Swiss-Prot record:
It holds the Pfam family Ycf4. Keywords: Chloroplast, Membrane, Photosynthesis, Plastid, Thylakoid, Transmembrane, Transmembrane helix. It is found in: Plastid, Chloroplast thylakoid membrane. The keyword Acyltransferase does not apply. Seems to be required for the assembly of the photosystem I complex. GO terms for biological process: photosynthesis. It is a multi-pass membrane protein. This is Photosystem I assembly protein Ycf4. InterPro entries: PSI_Ycf4_assembly (IPR003359). The gene is ycf4. The chain crosses the membrane at residues 21-43, 58-80. Belongs to the Ycf4 family. Signal peptide: none annotated. Disulfide bonds: none annotated. It comes from Nicotiana tabacum (Common tobacco).
């Protein structure tokens, strides 16, 4: 979502609370829970899941491996649920021409650097850069080059923008900030 006026441009950044992350976390949780139940069923010799009799899967090595996969999947699923609940990666980009300041804010993982806040002067911005990598895993990322600081990504790497969309976004931002555009 973007909000613009004559002097201020604010762009809200979606973090890890995306539908795809919810789906993957839910599917991974259910799958790993199933693996763990099958492994536990084979260990106990009881039918905890009614799909098959427990005698079909012996505990060593199949049940043990399935239990391991179930536990590993639960750890990965809990990691995904934590990143979703903490909304890692969300934040905003604020470009203020009146004050001459650019503020970039992102939420990180809990701890010392939970809040990531970067502040730059607009006069230190050298250019808005588009990096394009074509091929099987095509990638188009918009960067802001800061004098003495390097490049700061303004779009997510998994945000699959069309060439037209990324060009339009770069052109609008470069026009707003009054800086040149570079394409790599």
């Amino acid at each position: 979502m973007t909000w613009r006026s004559e002097h201020i441009w604010i762009e809200l950044i979606t973090g890890s609370r995306k539908i795809s992350n919810f789906c993957w976390a839910f599917i991974l949780f259910l799958g790993s829970l199933g693996f763990l139940l099958v492994g536990t069923s084979s260990y106990l010799g009881r039918n905890l899941i009614s799909f098959f009799p427990p005698q079909q899967i012996i505990f060593f090595p199949q049940g043990l491996v399935m239990s391991f996969y179930g536990i590993a999947g639960l750890f990965i699923s809990s990691y995904l649920w934590c990143t979703i609940s903490w909304n890692v990666g969300s934040g905003y980009d604020r470009f203020d021409r009146k004050e001459g300041i650019v503020c970039i804010f992102r939420w990180g993982f809990p701890g010392k650097n939970r809040r990531i806040f970067l502040r730059f002067l607009i006069k230190d911005i050298q250019s808005v850069r588009i990096e394009v990598k074509e091929g099987i895993s095509a990638r188009r990322v918009l960067y802001m080059d800061i004098r003495g600081q390097g490049s700061i990504p303004l779009t997510r790497t998994d945000e699959n923008l069309t060439p037209r969309e990324i060009e339009q976004k770069a052109a609008e931002l470069a026009y707003f900030l009054r800086v040149p555009i570079e394409v790599f």
